[in-house]
UniProtKB/Swiss-Prot annotation:
Gene transcribed to yield this protein: otsA
EC number: 2.4.1.15, 2.4.1.347
Lineage: Bacteria, Bacillati, Actinomycetota, Actinomycetes, Mycobacteriales
Chain sites annotated for binding UDP-alpha-D-glucose: 45-46, 297, 302, 400-404
Pathway: Glycan biosynthesis; trehalose biosynthesis
Name used for this protein in its record: Trehalose-6-phosphate synthase
Positions that bind D-glucose 6-phosphate: 25, 101, 155, 335
Length: 492
């Protein structure tokens, strides 16, 4: 069945919200307490920070999953108001989480879109569940949106929602943004449901990607898979949008690199408590001459093993000194029920143990590894404390950690080692750019960053900060929504 097929009559009424954000998760998490009751906990993030003021001004609503399993998926709860923000929970059963989220979203789409670092799994049952859950999100959005409202759908878990919502509510202006990389054409063509995904996205008025390459790939696929006429010229960043001509309307396609709340981070990092904590961190590490830092979700795309291998060989070759150089790796737990992630955790912990066994001393490991979430201010203090930030993904849509590190370095200290295969590399050209598949190149670049002169470091960091502070998450959201406003239905 085509996305959205046959369900147009289910929702006839209009909601009250003029602006609706649709994402896999709500900006708050619902938690089950020991007594069986539930409570809400705010889940801070860049997307929430950027869109919250707009949501408040425009009678906004946020549609998403609250984070706990609920088998009664057919019973719709009333909207929840949290801090003047209307939340529309979408319920997911245990089977939904297993097949739509852990299955199709994260064992099919995630590896496919990240260059098949791990082989994608194609299960028809997972696809059927993905269609069903996307329809549930579309119907919840239709009930929330006022007549003529603007709807912004977020990310790879919900790629069918635009077309489903278009069928339910043709009066809406619909935008879609993909937060992960969009794959090369030859990889995307492996997907058995490739045409359905492209048709799903073309339900939007504006389809946004981080990079121009993703936009160009999507235009090509629109021509190849559905025979649409498309623009042929190069797509620009926040400009020169591509176009896909459908029977009754035109879909715009653009590149909008996401960013962070850089001003807030800059201000927090300047606070004396953060500076004091940064000094304490270095003291707790034994006051080494150099501190290298990695901060990642524990994910096979992030290249954690690459930096550990490079550091191990630098120690073995004497190019990094075991008595005055340490590596701190902060790894946030992620998708722990998925087999490949469990294996990755075991592999990383084995690698850390080997390096410390080979080069550390009792009470003085050379790699400090934490596998747990780190509070926000503690993370900022680590950014301030680190001499070299290691961001070495094999593929990443953007990588906001790189930008966060730069935003925290008002002292113009530190060095950023950044994978060429992140979206951030297109903007942060003054970082030490590396190919994470080239181990010798990674080692040489890390060594250069460790030994850079003060003048060289300040020059690079000044340029990086100019970029990050000027292009913040508010500018990202405004640029997308301005383009969307120009793309929607003309007749209301």
């Amino acid at each position: 069945m085509a996305p959205g097929g046959g369900r147009g009559s289910k929702t006839a009424s209009y909601g009250n919200s003029d602006f609706v954000v649709v994402a896999n998760r709500l900006p708050v998490d619902q938690e089950r307490l020991p007594d069986g009751s539930t409570a809400w906990k705010r889940s801070p993030g860049g997307l929430v920070t950027a869109l919250e003021p707009l949501l408040r001004r425009q009678r906004g609503a946020w549609v998403g999953w609250p984070g706990i399993v609920d088998e009664d998926v057919d019973h719709e709860d009333d909207p929840i108001v949290q801090d003047d923000l209307e939340l529309r929970p979408v319920k997911l059963s245990a089977d939904d989480v297993a097949e739509y989220y852990e299955g199709f979203s994260n064992a099919t789409l995630w590896p496919l879109y990240h260059d098949v670092i791990v082989k994608p799994i194609y299960h028809r049952e997972w696809w059927d569940r993905y269609v069903a859950v996307n329809r549930r999100f579309a119907e919840a959005t239709s009930r929330a949106a006022a007549r003529g409202a603007t709807v912004w759908v977020q990310d790879y878990q919900l790629q069918l929602v635009p077309a489903m919502l278009r069928e339910l509510r043709p009066d809406l202006t619909i935008g879609f943004f993909l937060h992960i990389p969009f794959p090369p054409v030859e990889l995307f063509m492996q997907l058995p449901w490739r045409t359905e995904i492209v048709k799903g996205l073309l339900g939007a008025d504006l389809v946004g990607f981080h990079l121009t390459g993703g936009a160009q790939n999507f235009l090509f696929l629109s021509r190849r898979l559905i025979g649409a006429n498309t623009s042929r010229g190069a797509v620009g960043v926040r400009s020169r949008y591509g176009e896909v001509e459908l029977e009754s309307r035109v879909v715009r396609v653009g590149a909008f690199p996401i960013s962070i709340d850089s001003t807030a981070l800059d201000q927090t990092a300047r606070h004396r408590d953060i500076r004091r904590r940064a000094r304490e961190i270095r003291a707790e590490l034994g006051n080494p001459r150099k501190v290298l830092l990695g901060v990642d979700r524990l994910d096979y795309t992030k290249g954690i093993d690459v930096r550990l291998k490079a550091f191990s060989e630098l120690l073995a070759e004497g190019r990094a000194k075991r008595d005055d150089t340490v590596l701190v790796q902060l790894a946030t737990p992620s998708r722990e029920r998925v087999d490949s992630y469990q294996q990755l955790r075991n592999d990383i912990e084995r690698q850390v143990g080997h390096i410390n066994g080979e080069y550390g001393e009792v009470g003085h490991p050379v790699v400090h590894y934490l596998h747990r979430p780190v509070p926000r201010n503690e993370l900022i203090a680590f950014f301030v404390a680190a001499d070299v930030m290691l961001v070495t993904p094999l593929r990443d849509g953007m990588n906001l950690v790189a930008k966060e590190y730069v935003a925290c370095r008002s002292d113009l200290g530190g060095a950023l080692v950044l994978s060429e295969f992140t979206g951030a590399a297109a903007e942060l050209r003054q970082a030490y750019l590396v190919n994470p598949h080239d181990l010798e190149g990674v080692k040489d670049t890390v060594e250069a960053a460790l030994n850079q002169s003060v003048e060289e470091g300040r020059r690079r960091m000044r340029s990086l900060r100019r970029q990050v502070l000027a292009h913040d998450v508010d500018r990202w959201a405004r640029s997308f929504l301005d383009a969307l406003a120009e793309s929607g239905p003309r007749d209301g």
